[in-house]
Amino acid sequence: QTWNNSYLLDINMIDKQHMHFFKIFDQLLVLNKNFENYLALAPLIDELEKYTKVHFKTEEALMVKANVQDIDLHIAQHEIFIEKIDAFKTAYSYQNTVLLEQMIIFMRKWFLMHISEVDRKYAEPVQKYLEKREIKEM
């Protein structure tokens, strides 16, 4: 399932980052289907790892500034996803294309659930925080 606008949180920088994740997942799935492209997966896996860490730091910083409740639970979910990326890298290092495809699909589903159920909970307080900040800067 690719990106659609029902995943938007109406937080511009976060929505753009979420869209970028879907592009990475789409590219990983396409390249993994053809073993000749297997080596091309390495830079995408690195990008996924780096981008995930940047994105999670962005989300977490916004949640702290907006005084979002239950932030510890949210951060714990982020840590679980980062552990999955480590498992993903291990599957890649063993050239296990079946496991790799299962990992890509799992991470994409996890990410989709995380956006639609978990991230959505912080959207309103972060939007209010950003609106107040914009008013102060005017």
Model-derived features: positions:
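Small-residue-biased structural context
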Residues: 1-138
